Every structure is written in C-alpha cells, then in structure tokens.
C-alpha cells in the first residue's frame, strides 16, 4: 500500500484555489492550452511552497473534464500520481455523510427534529435529552470532542464514550466542529434502513452518482493505486 500523506491546507492554499477558479471562469472562450497554462501557473508554485509530494487537479470547463497530475503517489517507489491514483477524502467525507442523511430524510426514514435517543435507545444519560439529529449534523450538540478517543475499540466502548460525555453548553446554542458529532449523525441516519453505513453509502450515494472508484474500504485490487 502506498504511503499516506497528511496535509492541512492553509489560507494561502484556499486563496490560490479560489484564484484558479475565478481565472478559469473569466476565460469565457478558454482553449485547452489556456486552461493548462492557468492550472500550472497556479498550482506549481503552491506545490513548491507547501512541499507537496504529489497532487491531482481536475477542472471541468464547458462540460469537459481536464486532468492534471504532479509528483509521486509513493515517494519511496517513485510511483507517479496518475488519473487512477486514489487519495483519502479527509473531511470531504462529511459532505457525503450529509448527502446520505438527506437521502434518508427524502425517503421518510428520519427527521432532523428526531431525538438522538430514538435511534440509539441505549443512550440513556440525561445530557442527551433534547439533543436531536439536527444538533449532531450541525455540530451544535453542546461541545462534542473533535475525535473519538483511540482507546474506543468496540461498540460498548463507543456507547460508554458518549454516555460519559458532558456538554459544555445547551444544545443549539454554540457550534463546535467535531468528527464525533457528524460521525454519530451518519451512523444513526442509516439505522432505519437496516443497512450498514458502508452499504448505505455505496448503494445510496456512490452508485447513483456513478462514483465507481470511491470506497470506504479500498478493495485489494485497487490498493496499488492508493496514495
């Protein structure tokens, strides 16, 4: 499996990408060579500044996709980034979780106003009274931590973690970004379907969107493309 690379984009990176999008959108009659020039002029300095070992960029212009790649997916093996390289989605996965929750709402399986305990009755601690799926989806449950602790290894550990959590403020009053919040929302949103989270994501989001090379668990034949 290719080595993993963790990179947190800063304000400069976000500003640069915005500039790329604006420049491309302003080029009403941009030819492929112009698009190539715009992308390389924008991205190449960024790669050098941020010391990014490998990167892929896709631009859709007038309905046509353009793909650009730089560097290595695996530095040790000198394996280059290609159009088939698989990158971890990171926090973009939260967008997919939101879409999956929206699909469950559209099917009439859940409502955002539903209490969390409706889908996890074992969550009996009093602090969960009044916390809804909406609070979980919008990070407003009361200050859930950024991550689920590493020592949580089983479903009973997970229940204990949420049972012992103590909110810092009332639900719906403040927002705090937390993987343990949106993650729980996704897990509960699929419960009425009887599907696992992975099954629901595959059949209700990935397949309808024709995301045929997007997985939660990369299948062994595709691991050679993993960055």
Regions found by a protein language model. Give the residues of each.
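Short, surface-exposed loop or secondary-structure junction motifs
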Residues: 67-70, 74, 126-227
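Sec-dependent signal peptide recognition
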Residues: 13-19
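N-terminal signal peptide c-region/cleavage motif recognized by signal peptidases
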Residues: 25-27
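Short active-site loop at a secondary-structure junction
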Residues: 48-56, 76-136, 167-181
């Amino acid at each position: 499996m290719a080595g993993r690379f963790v990179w947190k984009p800063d304000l400069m990176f976000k500003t640069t990408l915005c500039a790329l999008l604006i420049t491309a959108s302003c080029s009403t009659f941009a030819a492929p060579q112009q698009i190539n020039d715009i992308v390389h002029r924008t991205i190449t300095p960024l790669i050098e500044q941020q010391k990014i070992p490998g990167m892929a960029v896709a631009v859709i212009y007038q309905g046509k996709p353009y793909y650009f790649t730089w560097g290595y997916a695996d530095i040790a093996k000198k394996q280059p980034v290609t159009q088939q390289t698989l990158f971890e989605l990171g926090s973009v996965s939260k967008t997919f979780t939101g879409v999956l929750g929206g699909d469950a709402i559209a099917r009439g399986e859940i409502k955002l106003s539903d209490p969390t305990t409706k889908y996890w009755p074992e969550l009996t601690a009093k602090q969960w009274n009044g916390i809804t799926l909406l609070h979980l989806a919008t990070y407003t449950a009361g200050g859930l931590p950024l991550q689920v602790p590493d020592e949580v290894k089983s479903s009973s550990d997970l229940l204990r973690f949420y049972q012992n959590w103590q909110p810092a403020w009332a639900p719906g009053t403040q927002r705090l970004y937390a993987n343990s919040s949106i993650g729980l929302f996704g897990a509960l949103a699929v419960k009425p379907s009887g599907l696992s989270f992975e099954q629901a994501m595959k059949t209700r989001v990935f397949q309808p969107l024709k995301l045929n090379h997007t997985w939660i668990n990369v299948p062994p034949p595709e691991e050679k493309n993993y960055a």
